């Protein structure tokens, strides 16, 4: 098997053994710095490690713009209304904040699911995109779905390795981590997912306008949704905004808004152990009845039963 890409000092083709050597080293470092199942940030700004075991319990979260490299195992995510399965050797790029339900489908104690995730600094990537010529100058301006999965380029994998190695040389992080992070952005921009990233980081593009609307919704989900006003915020006609919003997120603005609220309410009940009425009020619902109805519609059961089941499942997986 041959992977496209250029290693520093290497040729234009890299064989499987070269890819495996880099990936194996990354797995060692990931397991060293995340010794138990879980997910968390590292001392490198924006870099997180995820180590998980296979389970049937769906977890809900808000995926934020990032570049994720899968090192081992497989994961299934339902993002919007679409299902994605991805694993070792693949790169997941999130272009816009999206609510997701996910679980690991392949991960054991000896070979857990391992993933590295690098947050995308929108301003830095947008500035870099202006300096890097597009790979397809005549590319369409149509909106893209906000999620992309492709084979990871070995040059990106190698840059992630050099970034991870800094965890063992913390004194070098302040100087070298920003440089390697910028290199990862650059290599992604010139790679197979470059056009995808560029669409969400080009001022005035329809995808970036939708990303701006999504950011506003994320920051203001407790407030009532006025779609016409939100469309005006990003300089779009309401009908155009509706169409492009669904193209990017696979959800309507109203569905997206509800999902943000309900995911946060579920998180509050699970992690802060507040009751359903308080959780609904905290995320913007004025009517407990409406909150319970919409919660059951999304999660398939009333809040109390859902939270009890999730807590029992979490206890059983420990």
Indicate where each model-derived feature is located:
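Amphipathic alpha-helical segments enriched in hydrophobic/aromatic residues interleaved with Lys/Arg
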Residues: 15-20, 26, 127-183, 187, ...
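Residue at a beta-strand N-cap/secondary-structure junction
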Residues: 76, 224, 273-274
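A short, N-terminal "cap"/entry segment at the start of jelly-roll beta-barrel domains
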Residues: 1-43, 48, 56-57, 141-144, ...
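Short, structured loop/turn "capping" segments at alpha-beta junctions
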Residues: 139, 174, 192-196, 224
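Short alpha-helical segment immediately N-terminal to, or the first helix within
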Residues: 216-220, 267-271
């Amino acid at each position: 098997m041959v992977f496209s890409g250029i290693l520093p000092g290497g040729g234009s083709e890299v064989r499987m053994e070269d890819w495996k050597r880099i990936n194996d080293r990354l797995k060692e470092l990931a397991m060293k710095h995340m010794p138990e199942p879980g997910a968390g940030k590292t001392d490198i700004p924006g870099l997180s490690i995820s180590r998980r075991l296979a389970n049937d319990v769906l977890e809900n979260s808000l995926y934020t713009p990032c570049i994720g490299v899968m090192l081992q195992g497989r994961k299934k995510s339902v993002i919007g209304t679409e299902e994605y399965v991805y694993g070792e050797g693949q790169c997941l790029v999130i272009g816009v904040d999206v609510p997701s339900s996910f679980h690991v489908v392949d991960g054991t104690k000896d070979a857990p699911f391992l993933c590295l995730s690098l947050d995308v600094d929108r301003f830095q990537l947008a500035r870099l995109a202006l300096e890097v010529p597009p790979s397809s100058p005549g590319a369409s301006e149509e909106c893209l779905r906000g999620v992309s999965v492709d084979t990871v380029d070995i040059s990106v994998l190698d840059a992630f390795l050099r970034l991870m190695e800094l965890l063992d040389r913390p004194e070098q992080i302040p100087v070298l981590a920003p440089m390697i992070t910028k290199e990862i952005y650059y290599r992604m921009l010139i790679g197979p997912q470059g056009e995808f990233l560029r669409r969400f980081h080009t001022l005035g593009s329809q995808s970036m306008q939708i990303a701006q609307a999504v950011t506003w919704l994320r920051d203001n989900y407790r407030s009532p949704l006025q779609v016409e006003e939100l469309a005006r915020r990003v300089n779009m006609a309401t009908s155009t905004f509706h169409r492009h919003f669904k193209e990017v997120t696979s959800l309507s603005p109203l569905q997206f808004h509800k999902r943000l609220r309900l995911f946060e309410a579920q998180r509050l009940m699970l992690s802060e152990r507040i009751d359903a009425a308080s959780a609904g009020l905290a995320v913007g619902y004025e009517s407990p009845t409406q909150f319970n109805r919409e919660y059951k519609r999304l999660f398939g059961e009333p809040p109390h039963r859902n939270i009890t089941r999730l807590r029992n499942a979490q206890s059983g997986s420990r």
